[in-house]
Amino acid sequence: MAIRHVKRRYSESSESSSSDESVVDSTEISVDINDDDAVKPDNEESQLEGERDMATNDGMENNGCSDLSSDSEDSSSEESDEEPVFQRPIFIKRNQLAEVTDSNNQGNVLRRIEHENKVVEQNEEAKKQIATNYTTDKEILMKAMSLNDNDLIDPEGERLRWLERQKIRKEKYRKKLIDKQLELEEYEANKLLNRDIDKLEENTTTTTGEKDIPIKKSNRINNNKGDNEFKPKRVVNVTFKSLDDNETSAVANEDSEYSIL
């Protein structure tokens, strides 16, 4: 058994009589309540409160979803309607602007001066290199620069002068070949002469029967050191082949002592 004490306050009523002036401030009323009766209302109240909480949560979730959808729609519409954002301009005071322009002008002037100095130094170095390279060949360089290689002014005269130069070249080449041939013939003649002298010496030693007498070889011609390069031999089985057109042209183009004649 559970006992609850309930206190109640009674206010004075204007309708009460004067005889009932005594006021009861508080009265204690004892109520007997069974344990089962006390538990039931608590359970019912808790169930009601749980249902109310569920309903409020569902309402909040629905409201939140609707708010999110509306926010997303608003944000998409705002993004589509948004214009490109420009940076806010920065205004500089006149004094600061004048200082900045002065510093920029000074920096540009210094850069120009440095660039001009570098260009002057490079030109001087190039002149020095040219002077050192052509100090010994200045005359040749001047002659080469003064040559007139334009053939359009007098083509016939240029052709005649070219033919003259070609003729001089051929004569020089022919003279060179003749000198070489004469040198070879002289070598062969000296070799034959030395061979004859050796044979005469052998004959004199056999006929006398006496002791070998040394014979002066004053008549022998001293050969040069480069004579060993020439070793002529006798011709054996000489055959001449028929020359075709191609072979004749190749032989004609070949440089020899008779090619210029």
From Swiss-Prot:
A cellular component term, taken from the record's GO annotations: spliceosomal complex
One of the protein's GO biological processes: RNA splicing
Location relative to the cell: Nucleus
Bias type Basic and acidic residues, positions: 37-55
Keyword Iron listed: no
Region feature (Disordered): 1-88, 205-229
One term of GO molecular function: RNA binding
Keywords recorded for this protein, A-Z: mRNA processing, mRNA splicing, Nucleus, Ribonucleoprotein, RNA-binding, Spliceosome
Coiled coil: none
UniProt feature, compositional bias: Low complexity: 13-32
Comp. bias regions, Acidic residues: 70-84
Subunit structure: Component of the 25S U4/U6.U5 tri-snRNP particle, a subcomplex of the spliceosome.
Sequence similarity: Belongs to the SPP381 family.
Function: Component of the spliceosome and rRNA processing machinery. In association with the spliceosomal U4/U6.U5 tri-snRNP particle, required for splicing of pre-mRNA.
Descriptive protein name: Pre-mRNA-splicing factor SPP381
